[in-house]
Amino acid sequence: MPSLATASMAMRRAGYQSASLANQVYSNNVEGQFDHILPLSTRLPLGLNTPAYLARTAGHFIRAMFKVDIYHSFFSGGVLGHTPLQPIELSVVKLAGVKTVVMPYGSDAFVYSDLPDTPWARAIKRVYPRTKDQDRLVKDRIAQIAERADYVVGCIVHTANLPKVDKWTVLWYPPGHDIKPGPLCDSETSDPLRIAHPSNHRAIKGTDSLIAAVDRLHDQGCNIELDIIEGVTITESRRRMARADIIIDQLLMGYAMTAIEGLAMRKVVVSGFNRTEPLYQPFYDRSYLSQCPIITASPDTIQDVLLKLYNDRNVISVIQSESYDYFQKFHSDAACVALFGDVYAELGWTELRNDDVCEA
């Protein structure tokens, strides 16, 4: 997950010794984003793939236990997540005297049988189907990891099936330090309203509903450009997002990396969290979601939302300023460092910076 790398880099720039590891890097990831890569796909003869991967992974894990004070992982596991040793991973970490911080990122924390009957949950089940046995295994793993973790950091929507949450932050990761804020929209311009929508999962993102809404607005004479960004690198995606006035994240659920990239670029961001859905209430009560300037929309309302923005360019520049202020306060590198600094302090570690190691 790129989020793990951006969080790790933020901690390192703040003076922590932090390293990130991945066992799968997608083609759209930035080269060199992760400090260590243990690829699952290495091809070896004579059926040696599995034992070779297990040996490399176990070796890295053992070295880490001698170096780190804090061990970050997901609900799918950490370094040993794709090995038969995953069930004992956090127990070994605790035996080594290392504190564990677990964060959800997505399907790792979803138990399909226990999800609410909502459009986003139905979309996830269609895109990432599971058998009942697979779902039961995920449920058991979540319960086991939550019980053994020293600290669980929440993440919007992904707390739906978690047995415990110690920190109700909306998102725990920053988008990276290399994103620059763009200019404010000119309210007097006759240029088209430019919309960008990075989409890696059309069904989950509501992409087809967005396209249909923009087509209907075109029929009404609206001068709107829609850029559907798919199948490109993160660098190219961000370049195209930077040209837009409005970033559409997703129309069915929460908000995530695309949204905070848009906030960092000083864009108007539209996403699909339902302010009345009970799942979001803890993030209003215990976190900062009530301050969020992101415009909410669903597949049913996106046309009206875009038409309102099209007809009032003045409001766009106001929201742009609010977006960047919100980003700096809650989703910047500094916000990430403050978040995990507080977590480490609650775990009793107050002298990590500059002399100890935190491995993400």
Regions found by a protein language model. Give the residues of each.
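N-terminal subdomain of nucleotide-sugar transferases
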Residues: 1-36, 143, 149
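Active-site proximal beta-strand in glycosyltransferases
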Residues: 70-72, 90-127, 170-171
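A short, active-site helix/loop in glycosyltransferases that binds the activated sugar's phosphate group
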Residues: 111-112, 129-170, 212
